[in-house]
Each structure stands twice: as C-alpha cells, then as structure tokens.
Amino acid sequence: RGSNLTIHPLRNIRD
C-alpha cells in the first residue's frame, strides 16, 4: 500500500 505509518514499516511499503 505504501503507507508505512503502521507497525510494519518494511511490510507496509510493499503492501
């Protein structure tokens, strides 16, 4: 998704 504003900075960047 690109919203690394959650607990998963590395995982959110790809999701």
From Swiss-Prot:
The keyword rRNA-binding does not apply. It comes from the Eukaryota. One of its GO terms (molecular function) is aspartic-type endopeptidase activity. Its EC number is 3.4.23.-. It is an enzyme of class 3 (hydrolase). Coiled coil: none annotated. GO terms for biological process: proteolysis. It is found in: Secreted. One of its GO terms (cellular component) is extracellular region. This is Pregnancy-associated glycoprotein 59. Keywords: Aspartyl protease, Glycoprotein, Hydrolase, Protease, Secreted. Belongs to the peptidase A1 family. Disulfide bonds: none annotated. It comes from Ovis aries.
